[in-house]
Every structure is written in structure tokens, then in C-alpha cells.
Amino acid sequence: MKFKRPVYFDNINLVSIILLPLTLVTFIFNSFKKLSLKEKFKIKTICVGNIYLGGTGKTPLVLKIDKILKNKFKTVIIKKKYLDQEDEQKILKQNSNLICLGDRKKALMNAVKKNYKVAILDDGLQEKGINYDISIACFNSSDAVGNGFLLPAGPLRENLGELRNYDAVFLNGEKNNIKFLKVIKKIKKKLKIFQTKYVPINLKSFDLNKNYLFFCGLGNPNEFERTLLKYKFKIKKKKNIS
């Protein structure tokens, strides 16, 4: 869900330390969710999620996976319905088959009834009651894990150690975060790690001698700005509503 990221998410400071005892609530809540019986569906499932609260590049990766697989399989993207995420839902619907319901399990049952062969879930790693065939955790290479604390003291939805239960990590963004890569590799040696960068596909259609208004309505505004600056865009004004 969309939110304005607190400044204290980035580094350990007085506010994050004061809120640290409240992370016990998140830890206990996560522990209870792990007790859920995992349900297996008659469809191959790929979950692309994150443990960092914020834009980590999930949706572009979901669309890319769908684009590759739909050449050979009947694919569908599943996204849990939130009223404040209609923009993302529209993007997914324009580029793929989409089932968007308030319950992921019901969405998967719907996909099975419609004879889809592969379901790609946009978010859902914290849905412990589903037995995914492949689970992928996304990170932004610059933000990494922020101050490293669980919510509400930090940006983590679950402990970094949960990566040992997942199949792959995608580190998305401009920064080559070697330090964070080393941390990930220590958690699970056989974890597949992929590094990606954002590349504009229509760069030639822009006049880089002109000034531009920076407008971001979804995703990670900081990463979007870094990408524009990398490709020499002159940003005159900024407007961020994501």
C-alpha cells in the first residue's frame, strides 16, 4: 500500500530507537502467520514480493516474467486489490491477463477455473498460507534494508533472515551495492541473486537539451530520479505523489 516513507527508515536514529520495542508486535505477528497451513494450488505459482516496505521494482519484474512465459504458457498476473493501487492495477491489466481480488487464494482458485497454467503474483511473500513454486524477493540497490529494523522502527516487513526461505533475490537499481550483496550471500549460499538496472527504451525521443518536470506517481521516486540524471536529463522542477 502507498505511504510516505519516514526519514528515520533510512538510518538508525533516536526515533527508530524509541520505536524499537514496538517491533516485537511485528515479530510476534509474523511468527503466528508462519503457523498457517500452506495450501498448494493446481497451477504453477511465482511470487514476486519484498520484505522492504516501499518501491523495490516488483511490478516491472512481474511484467517481464509474464512477457517471457506467455510465449509458451497461458499466464495470469494476480494482485491483491487495494483501493489506493488502481494505477498499478491498470498498468498490469493493459499488459497482461489480470485477476485482482481482495483474497489471493480466491484469485488463485479463479485462475485454476479459467485454466491458466502459470500465476505470477505481484506481492505476497508475507502470505504464508500459500505454497509458492518459486518465491522472489526484490530490493532497491540503494535503499537495501534501510536502518535494518522491523516495522514500525524501520522499513522491514519481516527479518532479513527470511531470505533463506526464498528462491531468488533481485537487486534493482543504479547502485552496485557490494556490501549488501555480501550480507545476502551469508544468509543463504545457494540463493540465486540477480542485479538489474533500469534502461529507458525511448531515450531518442527526448531532447536532452531541454529542461524537464520530474513527476512520479508510483514506484520509487528516488530511483526514478537517479535513472533520469544518469541519462543526462535536466530536471527543472519536481513533483512526487507516490
Cite the ranges covered by each PLM segment.
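A transmembrane-helix-recognition feature enriched in membrane-embedded lipid enzymes
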Residues: 2-44
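Phosphate/Mg2+-binding loops and adjacent switch elements
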Residues: 83-188
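C-terminal accessory "lid"/substrate-recognition subdomains
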Residues: 2-5, 144-242
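Short, highly selective alpha-helical patches that border small-molecule cofactor pockets
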Residues: 58, 62, 85, 89, ...
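Conserved beta-strand elements of the Class I
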Residues: 76-78, 137, 212-215
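Residue-level signal for inorganic ion chemistry
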Residues: 25, 59, 92, 122, ...
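Rossmann-fold NAD(P)-dependent oxidoreductase module
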Residues: 64, 68, 122, 227
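Walker A (P-loop) phosphate-binding motif
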Residues: 34-84
